[in-house]
């Protein structure tokens, strides 16, 4: 519906613009999506720990980041709070209307990792699921890419680790070619219902790989066709 309205506005027959969401939300938005319909998301606090490749840098080109953490990424906190509302929104008359809930507050830090964005998530629900229900939802969740069997889509989209020290950036960012979301450390919280940690590969899932998957989706849905 958005693409059709966009083509009408632009006056194009075939061409259109498709965008993907910011790399900072790639881990925690998929991890929370399985619960929206049945449990409702009330409020979320998220702290992201983002690799230097997200700034287009390496340790060679950004030596100041070696053995360092910078507690500021320009514009990232605003995007991390606002973009999920668009992702979880609805389309009306060719326009995306943002979701009204959940309330989101974010803090984004640049850390000394080459690739991989990690997020510490605190969440409260309208209707609180059990921890077993959450793990079961993660294991069973399929996005549109899995339903269509797209070439770049991970077979298991969301993977939960029972080990207390997982996921780890070095060990888990390349799971399923860097396209899988890794989740761990689910436990009750004193201020929110639960807290957990999740990890995504920011330049694969969050950027280039996600863009390829988007092109595959648009092709499968008939928006991109051969001349």
Regions from the language model: what does each represent?
Residues 42-48, 52-195:
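C-terminal substrate-binding/catalytic lobe of Rossmann-fold NAD(P)-dependent oxidoreductases
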Residues 109-112, 200-205:
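Glycine-rich phosphate/pyrophosphate-binding beta-alpha loops
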Residues 22, 125, 198:
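Conserved residues at beta->alpha junctions
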Residues 1-65, 69, 101-103, 175, ...:
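N-terminal Rossmann-like NAD(P) cofactor-binding subdomain of oxidoreductases
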Residues 134-137, 210, 227:
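Composition- and surface-driven signal marking solvent-exposed, interaction-prone regions
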Residues 25-26, 78, 128, 205-208:
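Loop/helix-junction capping segments adjacent to catalytic residues or to phosphate/diphosphate-binding pockets
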């Amino acid at each position: 519906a958005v693409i059709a309205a966009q083509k009408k506005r632009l006056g194009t027959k075939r061409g259109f613009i498709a965008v993907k969401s910011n790399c900072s939300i790639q881990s925690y938005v998929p991890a929370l999506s399985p619960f929206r319909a049945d449990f409702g998301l009330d409020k979320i606090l998220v702290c992201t720990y983002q690799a230097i490749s997200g700034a287009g840098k390496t340790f060679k080109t950004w030596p100041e980041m070696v053995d360092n953490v910078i507690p500021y990424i320009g514009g990232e906190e605003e995007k991390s709070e606002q973009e999920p509302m668009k992702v979880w929104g609805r389309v009306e008359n060719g326009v995306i209307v943002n979701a009204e809930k959940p309330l989101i507050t974010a803090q984004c830090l640049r850390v000394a990792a080459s690739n991989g964005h990690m997020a510490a998530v605190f969440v409260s629900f309208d209707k609180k699921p059990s921890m077993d229900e959450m793990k079961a939802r993660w294991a069973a969740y399929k996005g549109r890419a899995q339903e269509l069997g797209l070439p770049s889509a991970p077979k298991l989209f969301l993977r939960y680790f029972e080990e207390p020290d997982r996921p780890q950036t070095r060990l888990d960012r390349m799971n399923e070619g860097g396209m899988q979301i890794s989740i761990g450390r689910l436990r009750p919280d004193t201020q929110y219902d639960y807290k957990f940690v999740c990890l995504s590969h920011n330049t694969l899932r969050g950027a280039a790989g996600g863009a390829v998957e988007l092109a595959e989706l648009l092709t499968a849905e008939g928006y991109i066709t051969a001349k």
